[in-house]
UniProtKB/Swiss-Prot annotation:
<dbReference type="InterPro" id="IPR020103">
    <property type="entry name" value="PsdUridine_synth_cat_dom_sf"/>
</dbReference>
<dbReference type="InterPro" id="IPR001406">
    <property type="entry name" value="PsdUridine_synth_TruA"/>
</dbReference>
<dbReference type="InterPro" id="IPR020094">
    <property type="entry name" value="TruA/RsuA/RluB/E/F_N"/>
</dbReference>
<dbReference type="GO" id="GO:0031119">
    <property type="term" value="P:tRNA pseudouridine synthesis"/>
</dbReference>
<dbReference type="GO" id="GO:0003723">
    <property type="term" value="F:RNA binding"/>
</dbReference>
<feature type="binding site">
    <location>
        <position position="111"/>
    </location>
    <ligand>
        <name>substrate</name>
    </ligand>
</feature>
<protein>
    <recommendedName>
        <fullName>tRNA pseudouridine synthase A</fullName>
        <ecNumber>5.4.99.12</ecNumber>
    </recommendedName>
</protein>
<dbReference type="InterPro" id="IPR020097">
    <property type="entry name" value="PsdUridine_synth_TruA_a/b_dom"/>
</dbReference>
<comment type="similarity">
    <text>Belongs to the tRNA pseudouridine synthase TruA family.</text>
</comment>
<keyword id="KW-0413">Isomerase</keyword>
<keyword id="KW-0819">tRNA processing</keyword>
<dbReference type="InterPro" id="IPR020095">
    <property type="entry name" value="PsdUridine_synth_TruA_C"/>
</dbReference>
<comment type="subunit">
    <text>Homodimer.</text>
</comment>
<comment type="function">
    <text>Formation of pseudouridine at positions 38, 39 and 40 in the anticodon stem and loop of transfer RNAs.</text>
</comment>
<dbReference type="Pfam" id="PF01416">
    <property type="entry name" value="PseudoU_synth_1"/>
</dbReference>
<dbReference type="GO" id="GO:0160147">
    <property type="term" value="F:tRNA pseudouridine(38-40) synthase activity"/>
</dbReference>
<feature type="active site" description="Nucleophile">
    <location>
        <position position="53"/>
    </location>
</feature>
Length: 249
């Protein structure tokens, strides 16, 4: 049995998320179907580093899977890349250590969130950036986003009813820039893990701060109170990208 690690990207528009679901199209299902075809009917299960939601995209999702027969990595990558649907791309593939696990091996993730602030919006980007047509104070958001950096209990920024008990995570970097070509706002977050809908809830809160409907201190208030009701709304998933995953050696 040989374990393989692959980096994949996908356009999340037509997917109901990464993780396999009944009666819904998912990234996991499409890749597993292709692997089954490539291995003559073997049932192959893949494991992903992150479980992206419906409509969420990825530049650098990491998966692993086991095959009974050893394969040439580049030939396997090419076969998987060309036989999966057009909205999935297999960027790289290599043999991995037997104990490597895409999800549980210690790693850091980087997410990017794009916001189209154009009036009118760019219709060509409607699936790839969240539209926010209201006035924003970018400097105020850039000041507020700094409060997210560090080790905190992010209970106030996760979805209600999540089953995860330990909600302490470390964000190593959080920035907001504006793309000079498109004018889009680019929120970037790096850390050792993120809770369910955490990034989208942080962005939703920052947009409310930028619009003046929440004070600049609101990030700190949400972290201290652990109260989801004090945070902003959940931003739409179409602006979210799993950008990169880096594993510790």
């Amino acid at each position: 049995m040989t374990r393989y690690k692959a980096i994949i990207s996908y356009d999340g528009t037509l997917f109901s998320g990464f993780q396999r679901q009944s009666q819904a199209r998912t990234v996991q299902e499409e890749i597993e179907k292709t692997l089954q075809k490539l291995t003559g009917g073997q049932g192959i299960q893949i494991h992903g580093a992150g479980r992206t939601d419906a409509g969420v995209h990825a530049y650098g999702q990491v998966i692993h899977f086991d095959l009974e027969q050893k394969r040439d990595p580049e030939k396997l990558r090419f076969a998987l890349d060309t036989q999966t649907p057009d909205d999935i791309d297999v960027i790289s593939l290599e043999a991995a250590a037997d104990d490597f696990h895409a999800r549980y091996h210690k790693h850091f993730k980087t997410y990017e969130f794009l916001v189209d602030i154009g009036r009118p919006k760019n219709p060509m980007m409607r699936h790839y950036a969240t539209h926010y047509p209201y006035p924003l104070d970018i400097a105020k958001m850039q000041a507020a986003i700094k409060d997210l950096v560090g080790t905190h209990d992010f209970t106030g920024f996760t979805a209600a009813g999540t089953s995860v008990k330990n909600k302490v995570r470390t964000i190593t970097a959080a920035t907001l820039t504006q793309d000079p070509k498109t004018g889009f706002l680019v929120f970037t977050f790096s850390g050792n893990g993120f809770l369910y809908k955490q990034v989208r809830n942080m962005v939703g809160t920052l947009l409310k701060i930028g619009n003046g409907r929440l004070p600049i201190e609101q990030i700190r208030l949400v972290l201290e109170s652990k109260n989801r009701q004090l945070a902003g709304p959940t931003a739409a998933g179409n602006g979210l990208y799993l950008k990169e995953i880096i594993y510790e050696e």
